[in-house]
């Protein structure tokens, strides 16, 4: 895996993690409409991470 590929994979993993954290916070605030949007965003972030992982290779993290 090249440095650029590793960077892209790390960024995708970070975005996936942050959208999940945001979703938890929105649920705590009972912000249902925003939580629904964030859940969709998290699903896309997870899909992006898995796609990058498949394309660029395994970084040793368990899905």
UniProtKB/Swiss-Prot annotation:
Keyword Transcription set for record: yes
GO molecular function: identical protein binding
Pfam families registered for this protein in UniProt: Rop
Keywords: Plasmid, Transcription, Transcription regulation
Nucleus is among the record's keywords: no
Function description: Regulates plasmid DNA replication by modulating the initiation of transcription of the primer RNA precursor. Processing of the precursor of the primer, RNAII, is inhibited by hydrogen bonding of RNAII to its complementary sequence in RNAI. ROP increases the affinity of RNAI for RNAII and thus decreases the rate of replication initiation events.
Subunit structure: Antiparallel homodimer.
Name of the molecule in the record: Regulatory protein rop
Organism: Escherichia coli
